[in-house]
């Protein structure tokens, strides 16, 4: 499958661009000197969050989990000692609320997204990024949240090997 994306120069000041996706959606891009839109490197993290987020929430619903709030955030570190300032480490945190959430269903949803379904995870993990896949289950007010790491993917992972049986200690 071929996906087409184009970027056109915005007729204005600064270095703003309008990105038009193959599905016809547009977004404003800017560099670090402006504030008109997202920086391209930020969009990698948005893509990571969106791709795994769709996978995980779909799996939770298929697993009959009642989710009252779901948020996925990605925090990443860039190297600063050399250019390009590539991402080297990221933490993907899935924060979930709901009555009687099954922790194992959540762990499995995150694992399957990270190893089988998330194209963005596969691409970033094949490159330079070590990605920590974590979750936090938020309970009723006053209760301590449950937090854990499901797995780590990358760096330099073979995208075809993601989802294959791993050595002892791997989550599934």
Describe these PLM feature segments.
Residues 48-52:
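Alpha-helical metal-binding/catalytic segments enriched in His/Glu/Asp
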Residues 1-46, 57-172:
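Extended beta-strand/beta-hairpin segments
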């Amino acid at each position: 499958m071929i996906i087409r994306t184009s970027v056109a120069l915005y007729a204005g000041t600064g270095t703003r661009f309008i990105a038009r996706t193959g599905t016809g959606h547009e977004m404003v891009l800017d560099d670090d000197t402006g504030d008109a839109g997202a920086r391209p490197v930020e969009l990698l993290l948005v893509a990571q969050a969106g791709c795994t987020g769709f996978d995980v929430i779909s799996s939770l619903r298929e697993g009959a989990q009642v989710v009252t709030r779901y948020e996925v955030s990605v925090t990443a570190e860039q190297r600063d000692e050399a250019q390009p300032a590539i991402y080297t480490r990221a933490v993907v945190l899935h924060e979930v609320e709901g009555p009687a959430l099954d922790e194992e269903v959540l762990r499995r949803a995150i694992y399957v997204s990270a190893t089988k379904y998330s194209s963005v995870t596969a691409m970033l993990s094949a490159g330079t990024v070590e990605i920590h896949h974590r979750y936090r289950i938020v309970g009723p007010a006053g209760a301590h949240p449950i937090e854990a790491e499901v797995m780590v993917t990358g760096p330099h992972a073979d995208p075809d090997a993601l989802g294959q049986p791993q050595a002892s200690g791997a989550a599934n």
